A protein has these predicted regions:
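Catalytic alpha-helical scaffold of carbohydrate-active enzymes acting on polysaccharides/glycoconjugates
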Residues: 2-155, 160-170
């Protein structure tokens, strides 16, 4: 037996056909929430994603091709996306690993300058199930984002969309 609260116990079931129609502002029919994830991948550990499967299999360290894929995003991809989002004045949320503020501060500075909303995304790109102290990781992430922006981050998106049964309560 476990004391953990399951996700299905946090939310009462509600079929969409039994709910009142959701009225959106200005008669809109759809909401689009633009979230840009920016992450720090540790080159001394197996990479969180494999775009290129190593020829010999396994998880080589360093895994330069997959680490470089992430690094391209921070050096090029972020800036190209930001240019388009700025051009069309798209309100954006930056889901960032807290360590972005120290390892890639230029990215965080530009998002802050653009008045983007900041959302915690772990301190580094490591599954919440693998983080040694989840409470500390979340607190460290919140603290560094608040120190950088002057505001608490709004919301949480676990790295790789992961969370534990305790994440919501932390």
């Amino acid at each position: 037996m476990t004391d953990q609260v399951r996700p299905s116990e946090r939310l009462e079931y509600s079929a969409i056909i039994d709910r009142p129609v959701l009225k959106l502002p200005d008669g809109a029919r759809m909401i689009v929430w633009t979230i840009l994830n920016v992450e720090v991948w540790d080159s001394t550990k197996p990479q969180p994603r494999m775009v290129i499967t190593p020829a010999a299999g396994g998880s080589p360290i360093p895994d330069v091709p997959n680490w470089a894929w992430h690094e391209y995003g921070n050096r090029v991809g972020f800036w190209r996306l930001k240019e388009v989002l700025d051009a069309f004045e798209v309100p954006t949320t930056l889901a960032l690993n807290g360590s972005i503020c120290t390892e890639y501060p230029r990215i965080a500075e530009e998002a802050l300058k653009a008045n983007w909303e900041f959302m915690g995304h772990g301190f580094s790109q490591l599954s919440m199930q693998k983080v040694e102290d989840e409470r500390l990781d979340i607190q460290k992430t919140r603290d560094i984002i608040q120190e950088f922006t002057g505001k608490q981050p709004r919301g949480w998106l676990g790295p790789a969309l992961t969370e534990t049964f305790e994440t919501v309560d932390l």
